[in-house]
Swiss-Prot record:
The gene is Il12a. It is found in: Secreted. Heterodimerizes with IL12B to form the IL-12 cytokine or with EBI3/IL27B to form the IL-35 cytokine. IL-12 is primarily produced by professional antigen-presenting cells (APCs) such as B-cells and dendritic cells (DCs) as well as macrophages and granulocytes and regulates T-cell and natural killer-cell responses, induces the production of interferon-gamma (IFN-gamma), favors the differentiation of T-helper 1 (Th1) cells and is an important link between innate resistance and adaptive immunity. One of its GO terms (molecular function) is growth factor activity. Disulfide bonds join C33-C106, C60-C192, C81-C119. The keyword Repeat does not apply. Belongs to the IL-6 superfamily. Keywords: Cytokine, Disulfide bond, Glycoprotein, Growth factor, Secreted, Signal. The lineage of its organism: Eukaryota, Metazoa, Chordata, Craniata, Vertebrata. Glycans are attached at N89. GO terms for biological process: cell population proliferation; cellular response to lipopolysaccharide; defense response to protozoan; immune response; positive regulation of T cell differentiation; positive regulation of T cell proliferation; positive regulation of type II interferon production; T cell proliferation. Disruption phenotype: Deletion mutant mice display normal development. However, they are unable to restrict the progression of Leishmania major infection with strong parasite load in lymphoid tissues observed. In addition, regulatory T-cells are functionally defective and mice are unable to control colitis (resembling inflammatory bowel disease, IBD). This is Interleukin-12 subunit alpha.
Length: 215
């Protein structure tokens, strides 16, 4: 009986020690960024599904819409976020980039490189552009009395959280002025176009964060 109590006591101590270690060991920056990007991927996919269901009369499917990339000629995510072995001339590409780069807490020291720093800076700019557009569209949607659809708050929060992790300069984001009396049909069609383009970009972002958090 005494031996059983002693073993139970040891097991309790071991469990308490394990829980204590779990509390004090911080989550690494790259792991947190991966978790945030996965959450963004999920909330974006959910928002795309919601838009397809609620805007089914607006041809809001990937097959029907006119695809438009608002980041085209503005950022270089697709070039800078290629695997390092595919970059033929890193220094040449870097000279064409702006000197202001953002990496925040997502880039681990062992994977630090000029291209990955530029990659994360470009991802940050992507998110900033989409966040600005989504805020303007959401304001326009909320101005419509029937409110057929509005953007999911979870997706907007997920964008903001990942941007905060990427933003080590503490940049204050400027919100785009709300759209005035915009045509409801045009606003909803633009929403469909943006959501599909954004969901594609989020897949790329999630892959980058997965690479950075891998051993």
């Amino acid at each position: 009986m005494c031996q059983s109590r002693y073993l139970l006591f040891l097991a309790t101590l071991a469990l308490l020690n394990h829980l204590s270690l779990a509390r004090v060991i911080p989550v690494s920056g790259p792991a947190r960024c991966l978790s945030q990007s996965r959450n963004l991927l999920k909330t974006t996919d959910d928002m795309v599904k919601t838009a397809r269901e609620k805007l089914k009369h607006y041809s809001c499917t990937a097959e029907d819409i006119d695809h438009e990339d608002i980041t085209r000629d503005q950022t270089s995510t697709l070039k800078t976020c290629l695997p390092l072995e595919l970059h033929k001339n890193e220094s040449c590409l870097a000279t064409r980039e702006t000197s202001s780069t953002t990496r925040g807490s997502c880039l681990p020291p062992q994977k630090t490189s000029l291209m990955m720093t530029l990659c994360l800076g470009s991802i940050y700019e992507d998110l900033k552009m989409y966040q600005t557009e989504f805020q303007a569209i959401n304001a326009a949607l909320q101005n419509h009395n029937h409110q057929q659809i509005i953007l999911d708050k979870g997706m907007l929060v997920a964008i903001d959280e990942l941007m905060q992790s990427l933003n080590h300069n503490g940049e204050t984001l400027r919100q785009k002025p709300p759209v005035g009396e915009a045509d409801p049909y045009r606003v909803k069609m633009k929403l469909c176009i943006l959501l599909h383009a954004f969901s594609t970009r989020v897949v790329t972002i999630n892959r980058v964060m997965g690479y950075l958090s891998s051993a």
